[in-house]
Amino acid sequence: MSARLWRGPMGSQVLRRTALALFTICLLSLPALGNSGGPPYLNGDGNPTAEYGCSCHNNGQISDRAVVMVTGVPIQYATSEIYDFTIQVADSHTLAGDDGNTQAGFVITSGDVGTFTWQDDQELRIAEDSQGDVSHSETSDTGIWSLTWQAPAADEGDIHFWVAGNSVNGDGAPGDDDYWNMLSFTINAPGTIENDDNAATLETRTVSVGSY
């Protein structure tokens, strides 16, 4: 069977329609690809995603149904010290044992102060177009990731962190059944609390947002 080659005005029209259809498919695929492979540094409004949140899920509305939690956060940091963080993002309905979303993603930033690292099996990446923001590289079925943060070598004052987390239904497209929330916290500068005054300087804590 030989291939048929369209020529003339009709052929040009067919080619234009085919190209337009392929272009439209690509555009429709971008949101799903962008979210499943991790959010970009900037959201759809042109603001840092970690600090301003997601503008594509749940019509851009923040929701307490999305629980965002970070464990291993120190009260204050010691210069060059390494801290182990665990990040969890979940649907509060799922945490309560009810039907809810079971997949999740996130992005975290320290304002490029200190350094994040992680093991290869964590499916993390530097967020697209950012210097040091970290996000998931694949949507997680557990919603739990482990990474380390190394404090800067010099006293940089109090360091502020922001985390945006998505709890999603896994259908590959942003929608009303996907929920996101934002968490911010601060790690105090060295010497904020003297060791002799409060043993809490040696402890880490869990910080979270959302209803559960």
Predicted regions and their residues:
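Secretory targeting signatures
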Residues: M1-G34, V209
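Short stretches within intrinsically disordered, low-complexity N-terminal or propeptide regions
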Residues: L5, V68, D129, T201-L202
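A short beta-strand segment in extracellular, disulfide-stabilized domains
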Residues: D84-T86, V209-Y212
